[in-house]
Amino acid sequence: MDKEKLKAIEAAMGNIEKQFGKGSVMKLGEKNILDIEAISTGCLGMDIALGIGGVPKGRIVEIYGPESSGKTTVALHIIAEAQKNGGVAAFIDAEHALDPSYARKLGVDIDNLIVSQPDTGEQGLEIAEALVRSNAIDIVVVDSVAALVPKAEIQGEMGDSHVGLQARLMSQALRKLAGSINKSNCVAIFINQLREKVGIMFGSPETTPGGRALKFYSSVRLDVRRIDTIKQGDEFLGNRTRVKVTKNKVAPPFKNAEFDIMYNEGISRTGDVLDLGVKEEIVQKSGSWFSYNDVRLGQGRENAKQFLKDNPELLYEIENTIREKYDLPIVKNNIKAEVEDKKEKKAEEV
């Protein structure tokens, strides 16, 4: 570059920093902006699909899908992972439907979880903004966008028309929130429902409420679907779930992850590791038998899952082999602490 041009740019950058503060303008190579930190989702398959080992810090994430597909479960697992690493989490419960006992079973520290149940959409988003601006929050979850009802709609009559009010509210809120979220390095997760457009002949009629702003501002969009029911005899044990990364600004998009969501347990870690182990040929499958090196894990998937649950050393070993393959952080073997935690939880339940 021309020396005079370089001097002029440096002078301009100096003036901008004087006026707007240090860090308001910089060269991309000076700061490791591209080294994006991530919070694990608590599901190895999903961490791999996201490409960076979890949801990106300082970004907006949208989780959407049909009813009872596992959207809130995924969000609660991310909160649990953030808290495990010493993070502070907030949950804006616009649906007024958060179940504390279920959250605890998923590993959420509910004693230190900041919860708000706002009366209006404006109030909920203002609370979220205040928490993000405090720079003390690592993750904030809004459940859900569809339940963020504008004040005018709440105060109006039941049959009144309020066209575009929620979309305007979301657009204005995200314009204000986006910069604060990035500066505070906080993850903002918006859970969203599905709606169907009327009269669509071609293409998907499915859409998400709250306008288009959230689609634009989100760095990651996750489509959560229930694809099957897990049964043992006549007993229903859980759901088989598929997550598709429909938008990803931090890694290649359109990757899928499939895992089990077990009732009263959440995402099955053993099932996730077992499936990935078979996929990566770390775990051998012969007929209905699963084996790892010389160890027989069991006949049938559920029996193999139970064997890994009873032998956490083996589970860690298989998981870390998969993590090494994808350059993800290695999980420390903290079996004694985990066993004690499980005993404490069982004692509390009794």
UniProtKB/Swiss-Prot annotation:
Binding site for ATP: 65-72
SMART domains, sorted: AAA (SM00382)
GO CC, one annotated term: cytosol
GO molecular function, one term: ATP hydrolysis activity
InterPro entries attached to this UniProt entry: AAA+_ATPase, DNA_recomb/repair_RecA, DNA_recomb/repair_RecA_CS, P-loop_NTPase, RecA-like_C, RecA-like_N, RecA_ATP-bd, RecA_C_sf
Pfam families: RecA (PF00154), RecA_C (PF21096)
Keywords: ATP-binding, Cytoplasm, DNA damage, DNA recombination, DNA repair, DNA-binding, Nucleotide-binding, SOS response
Domain of life where this protein originates: Bacteria
Subcellular location: Cytoplasm
Entry similarity comment: Belongs to the RecA family.
PANTHER family: MITOCHONDRIAL DNA REPAIR PROTEIN RECA HOMOLOG-RELATED, RECA
Function text: Can catalyze the hydrolysis of ATP in the presence of single-stranded DNA, the ATP-dependent uptake of single-stranded DNA by duplex DNA, and the ATP-dependent hybridization of homologous single-stranded DNAs. It interacts with LexA causing its activation and leading to its autocatalytic cleavage.
Entry protein name: Protein RecA
Organism from which the protein derives: Clostridium tetani (strain Massachusetts / E88)
Lineage: Bacteria, Bacillati, Bacillota, Clostridia, Eubacteriales
